[in-house]
Amino acid sequence: MTNQLIYTGKAKDIYSTKDENMIRTVYKDQATMLNGARKETIDGKGALNNQISSLIFEKLNMAGVVTHYIEQISKNEQLNKKVDIIPLEVVLRNVTAGSFSKRFGVEEGRVLETPIVEFYYKNDDLNDPFINDEHVKFLGIVNDEEIAYLKGETRRINELLKDWFAQIGINLIDFKLEFGFDNDGKIILADEFSPDNCRLWDAEGNHMDKDIFRRDLGSLTDAYQVVLDKLKTLD
């Protein structure tokens, strides 16, 4: 059925389209934390995230990364390929921050000699637990070869993103990616890339990401607008 709501999430709603292999993604003006325990409507957030994610995915596509992104169709909507989402959050950390610092008792801001890739099991009931490769295989999520691909592709994407953000004076601290299987069974990048699912610090260490909301540091949309404006200056 066309235009049927098929999934509602914390930050996005997904609708069917005339093409069964495509979906329409609508970005919402909602900010959440602690798996939705705290919610707040922030006018303009959805449009900013959609525009930032669209710009990043367009550049990734051009760089040879296979993604679900097709096109931006309005300020807060985009057209995507339909995929079967892999229930893993793939997190890459360039600098210690957030839960990593708390888990291992290290200060925020320590540059990691080698970026660290982590897996989290996408399960709201379990609060998305931190898991390792053996857990991933035990749960039957993906196999050894697919684990290696997810890690390698995430590291490749990191090198591209770090370079782009460095060009506009922003440090890419960490980020979360999601992948899915397309109709041909190929793993491709899905979901989004916005300040909602990464940490971005300017040269002075000021947050330009969702930590502004988490830590009550000021205007979320003002910071997101700066990120968007800077990204638009990239070649």
UniProtKB/Swiss-Prot annotation:
The gene is purC. The keyword Nucleotide-binding applies. Keywords: ATP-binding, Ligase, Nucleotide-binding, Purine biosynthesis. One of its GO terms (molecular function) is phosphoribosylaminoimidazolesuccinocarboxamide synthase activity. It holds the Pfam family SAICAR_synt. PANTHER family: MULTIFUNCTIONAL PROTEIN ADE2, SI:DKEY-6E2.2. Belongs to the SAICAR synthetase family. Pathway: Purine metabolism; IMP biosynthesis via de novo pathway; 5-amino-1-(5-phospho-D-ribosyl)imidazole-4-carboxamide from 5-amino-1-(5-phospho-D-ribosyl)imidazole-4-carboxylate: step 1/2. This is Phosphoribosylaminoimidazole-succinocarboxamide synthase. It comes from the Bacteria. The lineage of its organism: Bacteria, Bacillati, Bacillota, Bacilli, Lactobacillales. It catalyses: 5-amino-1-(5-phospho-D-ribosyl)imidazole-4-carboxylate + L-aspartate + ATP = (2S)-2-[5-amino-1-(5-phospho-beta-D-ribosyl)imidazole-4-carboxamido]succinate + ADP + phosphate + 2 H(+). It comes from Streptococcus agalactiae serotype Ia (strain ATCC 27591 / A909 / CDC SS700). GO terms for biological process: 'de novo' IMP biosynthetic process; cobalamin biosynthetic process. Its EC number is 6.3.2.6.
